[in-house]
């Protein structure tokens, strides 16, 4: 296997693209297409955003097949945890989980929902 690309369905690619750029502290750019955008850093793909219902991908046909966020967790390992936390707090009204140390990994983490849930 060469590389894993995580693709998530979103309602508005441009809005979600800007939201994830803000969260991850990436420089602002525009997605390449209205229906698809790839977030990259240092030559690595971090996340692909795909508009629901485009390109006939069965798992991305409709968000109505499952509740938003059901079965999907995205963990981003960052070098700037405190800065990422500060950015996250500007993007949501409240975190889903406040910062804490994960007992399994021994790393600090917090949880929030993106614009699509």
How would you describe each model-predicted region?
Residues 1-5, 26-77, 83-113:
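Vicinal oxygen chelate
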Residues 12-13, 79-81:
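Helix N-cap motif at beta-to-alpha junctions
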Residues 16-21, 88, 117:
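Conserved active-site tyrosine of GNAT-family acetyltransferases
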């Amino acid at each position: 296997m060469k590389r894993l690309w995580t693709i998530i369905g979103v309602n508005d690619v441009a809005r979600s693209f800007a939201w994830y750029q803000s969260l991850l502290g990436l420089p602002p750019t525009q997605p390449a297409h209205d229906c698809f955008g790839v977030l990259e850093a240092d030559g690595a793909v971090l996340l692909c955003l795909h508009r629901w219902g485009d390109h006939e991908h069965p798992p991305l046909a409709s968000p109505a097949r499952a509740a938003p966020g059901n079965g999907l967790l995205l963990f981003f390992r960052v070098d700037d945890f405190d800065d990422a936390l500060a950015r996250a707090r500007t993007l949501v009204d409240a975190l889903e989980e406040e910062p804490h140390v994960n007992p399994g990994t021994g790393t600090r983490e917090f949880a929030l929902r993106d614009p699509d849930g």
